Amino acid sequence: MEGIRRAAQRAVEEFLQAFPMGPGSLFVLGGSTSEVLGERVGTRPSLEAAHAVLEGLLPPLLERGVHVAVQACEHLNRALVVERETARAFGLEEVAVFPHPKAGGALATAAFLRFQDPVVVESLKAQAHGGMDIGGVLIGMHLRPVAVPLRLSVRKIGEAVLLAAKTRPKLVGGARAVYTREEMLKKLEEFLPKPP
């Protein structure tokens, strides 16, 4: 389990280096502990593996003031475990259910046990700024548009394939639009007074 914890920690540290999430950001985690242990999703939930993943992932995120949502399995319609404070901050609707390893999954259950004031919410309303998918459980529905894949050097947590994504604001405009501050300042040069 120590190898799982270390891999999760390395992955989230690399993620945060590539995409520095600030205080108040929302990170979504989806994962299958069965896949982490080399089994097919849903066949071997493990609270021990779930706690190892969370021990690696949570501290770097929480130290930065990032809100964390942990996705439950399809039996709970991909509902998510969050802190009550997170639900309030993002206007999320609480649902009346308690996860367990066979209905919700081990990762959501472990998060519910670890969080200080946990609630389960129906959806993130596509407000997550970034996230990780451990084992191909699909988190895209929770991400803001536009999602951008992050290629990390950590490719697996245990035996589970690791996918990561950040998001960026939509690019709007047409042929004359610019998308960086540098481009904007260059365009402004033609409007500045010329020296005599």
Curated annotation (Swiss-Prot):
Entry-linked SUPFAM superfamilies? TTHA0583/YokD-like
- Domain of life of the source: Bacteria
Q: Read off the Pfam families from this record.
A: DUF436
Annotated InterPro entries: Antibiotic_NAT-like, DUF436
Family per similarity comment: Belongs to the UPF0340 family.
The protein's name: UPF0340 protein TT_C0214
| Species name | Thermus thermophilus (strain ATCC BAA-163 / DSM 7039 / HB27)
